[in-house]
From Swiss-Prot:
Motif (Cx9C motif 1): 19-29
Renumbered ranges of motif Cx9C motif 2: 48-58
Leader sequence segment: none
Family stated for the protein in its record: Belongs to the TRIAP1/MDM35 family.
Organism classification: Eukaryota, Viridiplantae, Streptophyta, Embryophyta, Tracheophyta
Key word Mitochondrion present: no
Protein name: Uncharacterized protein At4g33100
Amino acid sequence: MGLLKKKDSTSARSSTSPCADLRNAYHNCFNKWYSEKFVKGQWDKEECVAEWKKYRDCLSENLDGKLLTRILEVDGELNPTKQATDSKESSS
């Protein structure tokens, strides 16, 4: 029972986040993709990219001035193709 209370309080805390809806949309998309496609060996196409970008942008805006923005910078360093795609989209 203690776990349920802790889980509920964590859920309540995250729902007050300005990015909570975007986070939920991304997680729902990812979980659906993982369970319906990835597990079956169908991972050719990048899915949930739009949801991830919206969530990442929201985090970036809301974490400005905090050391947590480093997480988003590391994501770019670990995914250089994503940086190239983001650059192409911003220049269009």
